[in-house]
Amino acid sequence: MAENGEEKLLAVARHIAKTLGHNESMADDILQIFSNFDGRFSREKLAEGQAGEDGSGVATLERALNSIDGQISRFVAADQPIWADPADSAAFLDTIDELVAIIREWSPMASEKPIGICLTRADDMMQQAMFRIEEEFRSLMERGAESFGLNPQGDAGAMNHRFDSEEEEDDDRDFNNGDDIQIPVAQPLTDYDLIIDALPSATINDLHEMAKRMLGAGFGKACSHVYSSCRREFLEESMSRLGLQKLSIEEVHKMPWQELEDEIDRWIKAANVALRILFPSERRLCDRVFFGFSSAADLSFMEVCRGSTIQLLNFADAIAIGSRSPERLFKVLDVFETMRDLMPEFESVFSDQFCSVLRNEAVTIWKRLGEAIRGIFMELENLIRRDPAKAAVPGGGLHPITRYVMNYLRAACRSRQTLEQVFEESNGVPSKDSTLLTVQMSWIMELLESNLEVKSKVYKDPALCYVFLMNNGRYIVQKVKDGDLGLLLGDDWIRKHNVKVKQYHMNYQRSSWNKMLGLLKVDNTAAGMNGLGKTMKEKLKQFNIQFDEICKVHSTWVVFDEQLKEELKISLARLLVPAYGSFIGRFQNLGDIGKNADKYIKYGVEDIEARINELFKGTTTGRK
């Protein structure tokens, strides 16, 4: 009994020495203290017992490794997938867990040669197991992707609800409850209103168990690489089926504009599907496979989505730094608005540290698109300035530059809110009463009006010059009044330009018809009846000649606006008809000359009205 107690006491002493001795020197010191305290704790007795115990421990370790080695060798050599049989997969994972536990337990004693040799063997076995589990992981990823299903869902609200943050948190908590998890597939998508199944929940659970072992064994990078390569290939296929080509910036710039317009439409669809459906689904899939390992999930997600994201961003960047020809404005606006609307998705989907570069690049390219839009307006200004004053427009009609600029600005103002945002983000300072977009539009209008003033000088006839300005001025006012451009420029601008048009009207009248009116004025100081009759007869003769000439010429001129044309005719009739009627009435009452007045009077009052009504019947093509 005493001997048994002494053995226990020695065992306790050995255990204390082994536990407290962090290295061989410290253990020797502890043994020396015990030996000095009691002769029974001699260093020889304690050392002998410890040696026997350690030898037994190494043997136990070797036996455990032999057993595990046999199991791992069997699984590694298996021709069939281990995860084809749930019992095999469970046994394989248990074996790995045993090996991990042994390595962790014995690693603190790795400096002891026999144990170090065993641990080296254990590491080799672990590497074999990891190679096999990596193969199984890849195979399961590929098989799962092949078994996807695509199911349209009619309720858009339900789809949006699936993507909100609360739903994601609930899904994370319920990772192991067996519920199906919706993830993206490489199918042609024409609507965001979809529920997509790619990997069954059982497959996700299996992948998670594998990932947990690989990460726990220090093979996290290998696991992330396999996962990322499989999902990246799948995601790129999804983007391809959405119609998105892999184009370099140079290829985009060389593409004919009509083809590029179609490519932009495809890009917009692909960007929306990617940011609203595919990327969020990949994010959730990563979180489930790497549940409990947030860094691995973040890194894997970034590796999966980086290529497709860069493809999307590079295309948008190519548009931003490409040609700034004015006709490209509307498609550039489409790309800008798409990027703007997707900014919340960029912020939420790429919120982790690994994706910050992608997130920041998206913001940079979005701002660059805004710069491109402002640059396009500068190019429009240059186009107006450079438009030459060469051949005159026949009949003083609409100039093509007027029609182009006004229709362009009207179309642009349909995106008024976007343009206001673009110009507010520039370095300009708005005035107290107007936005920077208003300032920009006012400046373009001023350039256009100045350009038209120069072009009007091409006409040698001053009256035709004013008809040209009147036509183009009226067209400008009408286009401003009828759309959002009027909201930008304001009622005061419209009133001022209506006054301008009326001034052109008056100038036209003065430059041509006021001379006619002068011929119908009679100087009462003329000497005698015969002198007055002779004067009136000469004036009537000149009136007939000039009236014929003016009507002949002005009937070929153009006034495109029917209301303006009627206003002009009424104004001329009011000016001319009463004066002419008074003149011929007086002429007819001049005694003998008056009796023969019909010989000199070519037109009656009604004839004058009819001839005035025939004015401005030149072609009105190009009015749109």
UniProtKB/Swiss-Prot annotation:
Gene knockout outcome: Twisted leaves with small spontaneous lesions, early yellowing of leaves and anthocyanin accumulation defects. Chlorotic shoots. Retarded growth with wrinkled rosette leaves under long-day growth conditions. Impaired abscisic acid (ABA)-mediated and mannitol (drought)-promoted stomatal closure. Increased number of lateral roots. Plants impaired for both B1L and EXO70B1 produce more lateral roots than single mutants.
GO CC annotation: what is one?
exocyst
Its subcellular locations are: Cytoplasmic vesicle, Phagosome; Endomembrane system; Cell membrane; Vesicle
**What are the recorded GO MF terms, alphabetically?**
phosphatidylinositol-4,5-bisphosphate binding
User: Which keywords fit this entry according to its UniProt record?
Assistant: Cell membrane, Cytoplasmic vesicle, Membrane, Transport, Ubl conjugation
Record's comment on post-translational modification: Target of the E3 ubiquitin-protein ligase PUB18 that mediates its ubiquitination and degradation via the 26S proteasome.
Do you know which InterPro entries this protein is assigned to? Cullin_repeat-like_dom_sf, Exo70, Exo70_C
Coiled coil (residue ranges): none
| Family stated for the protein in its record | Belongs to the EXO70 family.
A GO BP annotation:
regulation of stomatal closure
* Signal peptide residues on this chain, from the entry's feature table: none
UniProt name for this protein: Exocyst complex component EXO70B1
Where does it mainly reside?
A: cytoplasm
Is this entry keyworded Transport?
yes
Where is the stretch described as Disordered?
Answer: 148-176
Role, per record: Component of an exocyst subcomplex specifically involved in autophagy-related, Golgi-independent membrane traffic to the vacuole. Regulates autophagosome formation and autophagy-related Golgi-independent import into the vacuole. Positive regulator of both abscisic acid (ABA)-promoted and mannitol (drought)-promoted stomatal closure. Involved in the regulation of lateral root formation.
Can you state the subunit structure given in the record? Interacts with EXO70B2, SEC5A and EXO84B. Binds to PUB18. Binds directly to B1L at the plasma membrane and in small vesicles.
Pfam name, any one: Exo70_N
Query: Which branch of life, at top level?
Result: Eukaryota
